[in-house]
């Protein structure tokens, strides 16, 4: 379980895993920056109750709350009509999420002819996962409704994960930088333990590209479906095939053990 910038769900996940007879790796997905570019860093096997993770959540979600209205303003400036109360009704807490903005905008008949939303409607170029794609394209870094936030340095995030029992893996690199070897090499130099080569954002070529780099550096080539429920309707939980998931599981658990991290085995 690797929620964005939060480890708060781990106790509940641990109870459910025990009830269902499942193994559980506690984790987190930390938002961070390297040379001005945003990345997501997975921490597997962390001591989820350590105060540093609550501090990360407080900082990041505090920023998200502070910029929420600015994001809504920026989306409306593109000619998209928003029912703001409907957006807020979908959001947990008091910070908006781009997937909820997309859902409300696409369901509003007043936006039927909005050209900005055309790619996210059935048959459109970005309709495979319309809500998430809207978030990346419109509200993400470089998008027309992007509102910047300040995230911790990438190397600092790697160090925090290592210092608290975890294994540091770069999430969905192809989504952030396509196939960029020079930048990947720089990120590896910060102390990465793995690259998420197999995920829903990667085609076969991109998976092979990051698998090759991981192998060259003796890193794990991990997998993750990036399952987000309704936000990504084309993804089933636990999919996106690694050629040998059992071997990866064993290697990951061994690495977590070396870090004195945690894996809950049923």
Q: Which residues does each PLM region occupy?
A:
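Surface-exposed cleft-lining segments at the edges of enzyme active sites
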Residues: 90-91, 139-148
């Amino acid at each position: 379980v690797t929620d964005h910038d939060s480890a708060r769900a781990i106790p509940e996940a641990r109870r459910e895993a025990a009830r269902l007879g499942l193994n559980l790796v506690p984790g987190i997905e930390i938002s961070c920056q390297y040379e001005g570019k945003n990345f997501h860093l997975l921490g597997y096997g962390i001591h989820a109750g350590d105060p540093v993770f609550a501090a990360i959540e407080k900082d990041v979600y505090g920023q998200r709350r502070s910029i929420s209205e600015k994001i809504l303003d920026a989306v409306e400036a593109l000619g998209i009509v928003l029912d703001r109360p409907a957006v807020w009704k979908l959001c947990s807490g008091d910070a908006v999420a781009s997937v909820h903005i997309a859902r409300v905008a696409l369901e509003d008949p007043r936006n039927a002819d909005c050209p900005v939303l055309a790619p996210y409607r059935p048959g459109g170029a970005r309709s495979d996962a319309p809500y998430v794609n809207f978030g990346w394209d419109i509200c993400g870094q470089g998008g027309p409704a992007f509102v910047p936030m300040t995230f911790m340095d990438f190397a600092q995030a790697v160090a925090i994960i290592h210092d608290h029992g975890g294994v540091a893996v770069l999430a969905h690199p192809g989504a952030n930088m396509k196939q960029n070897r020079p930048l990947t090499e720089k990120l590896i130099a910060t102390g990465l333990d793995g690259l998420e080569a197999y995920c829903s954002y990667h085609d076969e070529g991109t998976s092979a590209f990051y698998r090759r780099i991981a192998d060259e550096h003796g890193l794990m080539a991990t997998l993750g479906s990036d399952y987000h429920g309704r936000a990504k309707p084309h993804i089933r939980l636990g999919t996106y095939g690694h050629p040998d998931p059992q071997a990866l599981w064993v290697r990951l658990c061994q690495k977590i053990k070396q870090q004195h991290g945690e894996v809950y085995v049923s």
